Amino acid sequence: NLNISRMNGLSGNYGSSFLNDKVNYTPMILCFAQELFFQDINLEVNKKINKKTRSTFVLANQIYNKDFLEGKTKGENGMISSSIIVADITHKIKKGHTIRMELQNLFSQQLKEAEKLAEGDWSMGLIEYTVSPNWFFTVQDMYNWGHEDSKKRLHYLNLNVGYSKKSNRFEIGYGKKREGIFCVGGICKLVPSSNGFNISVSSSF
């Protein structure tokens, strides 16, 4: 599968305002501004190796306007370009027992000079063991090995245990999480960095 997405601002005209705050803005439809907000080009390949093993490989290139998308001061982080490699392998050990392994690597660079040092390159490894239909156990480590500040080349290790019953899901975990955009089910939010236990309960009706 090949997917391409791109998001630019729209050119437009600012109307007059009593406060001169440029709130009154009329966009020009189908007239894209030069400033790029986000771009994603990715290729996904799914391969069934045998009856018990299947794999997914992804190559992606993204351009991310961090200042605009995260509401930060312009020039603080700049425009970030990243190339991403993902390998995901799932193996069925026996009936009801499955292990999944995922490896990711992100190579990034700032396209424009910024006030803050670049976070640079990342690697991520994950092992997930599932006992159907209820239990799953996960170990994940993210390592920011390419940060320009060597003191911030940190590991973000997380351990999670979850239990599912019908339409209910319970999960408890412990680990270190980095600040950033966190997305679940197509809904994204900015979360602060944290270190400790977390408990989540979700139900569908």
PLM ranges: what are they?
Residues 1-205:
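Exposed, low-structure sequence patches enriched in small/polar residues
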